[in-house]
Amino acid sequence: MENPSPTRTTNLQRIRSLYRLQEDKNNLNIPEPINGKVQEIDTKESLENVDRYGNYRSDFNVNNLGFYKVSKDPTLDKPNPAKRLGNKLIGHDDMLKYVDESIFMVVPGESHDRNEISAKELSRIQKWKSMCSIHLVSGNQLHSFRKTRKLILRTFKGIPDCWRSIAWWSFLVDSLPDKKLIDKYYQLNEQICDYDVQIDLDVPRTAATHFLFRKRYIGGQRLLFRVLHAVALYIPRVGYVQGMASIAATLLIYYPEEQAFIMMVNLLENRGMGDLFSSGFDTLLKAFDMLKHELSFTQSGRHLAEIGAEPSAFATRWYLTVFHQCVPFHTQLRIWDLLFLLGGSKGQTVRLLQATSLAVIQGMWDTLIDADFEVVMQALSGVIPIQNDNALLARIQLFWEKMPSENSSKSKRN
C-alpha cells in the first residue's frame, strides 16, 4: 500500500477521531464530519417498532410480494417415494417435505416479527441444549457441538436464535477468544489505515434498518468501523472490500467487537471468504462460471442464459455479502447457520453459496421462466421477499448434497 499524501493522512486521522468518540447518552457531542453532513438522530424511534432481530419493521415490508408468483415447484429432481419413506423412518426426511412448497408462501401461524417464543421453538431450544457440551477452560465456559448427522439436519431446520451466537462460535472457532488476537485488535485500531475513507463511506449505509447502526459515529457504526479497520490491516492481501461491511455488521449484532473481529478473521482465513474478496476477484469469477454451468442443467437457468442474465450481474452481492439485504434477515440467518457449520476453505463455502443461489433461482422459477431481461434483473437484484424459509432450505439441502451436474439421471433433468 502506498503512503498516503499529507492531506489524505489528515483526513484519515479526522475519520479515526470521529469513531473514537466516547459514548455518552447525556451529551452526544458529535464533531462535524468531513463532508459537512451529520446523520440525524431520531429520538422518537421506539423499540416497540423493532422486530425480534433488532430491525425496524417499517424499513422492510413485502408489499411487492405480488410481483412474485406463488405456486408449487414441479421442476426439482426429488428423491423417489421409496427413498423418502426410508429416510423418514430413520428421521432423515424432515426438510424434504417442504421442497414442493413456494418460497413466497406465507406460512400460517409463523411470524418473524413477533418476539414471543412458540411452543415449537421452545422444543427446538431444548433439543439444541441437549446437543451442547460445556467444558471449563481456564475458569471459562466453552460450548461445543459434535458434528453429527443430527447436528447437520437440525442446522438445516434453523438454529434457535438464543443459541445462534454460541453455535456459530463453536462451529467456526471452537476455543476461547485468543487474548493475543484481542490485543492485536486494539493495537491495529491505533494505526492509520488507507482504507478508512472508503470504510467511512460504507458504514452508514450498511445494515441501516437495524437499531444498532442508526446513529452516526457512535454505537454500532463506531464498532463496525473499528472492526473493518482492524481486519483491513490484519489481512493485507484482502484489505477492505465493500461486501465485508455487511458480514461484520451481522456479526456485531451477535458479538462484542473483539469477538466479531475474531469471527471475521476466521471467516476470511479459514472459510474461504478471503479468496472471494482477494485482489482481481479471480476466485469469485471462477465461482460464477461454476454457477453458470450448474444453471445450464435447469430450465430456469437456461432461460437466464438465453436472455443474457449472467451470474455476475445478479449474484455478486449474494456471494460477497452472503445474502445480506438480498433476502429478509430471518432468511439470511438460516443461510448463515449453514455457512458456519458447512463452509470451508477447500470449496465448501463456494459450494454452499452455489447451492443457495440455485435454490433461490429455482424457487423463483415460475416468476423468471417467461420474464424478459429487465424483469429478471428486477426480481433478482432487490430484496427477494422470501416468506417460507423451510421451502428454501429444503432446496438448498438438495443442491448441497447433489448439484444438478452431479445428478446421474439425465433423463430427469429439467
From Swiss-Prot:
Keywords: Cytoplasm, Nucleus. GO terms for cellular component: cytosol; nucleus. It is found in: Cytoplasm; Nucleus. One of its GO terms (biological process) is vesicle-mediated transport. Residues 158-343 form the Rab-GAP TBC domain. One of its GO terms (molecular function) is GTPase activator activity. InterPro entries: Rab-GAP-TBC_dom (IPR000195), Rab-GAP_TBC_sf (IPR035969), Rab_GAP_TBC_domain (IPR050302). This is TBC domain-containing protein C1778.09.
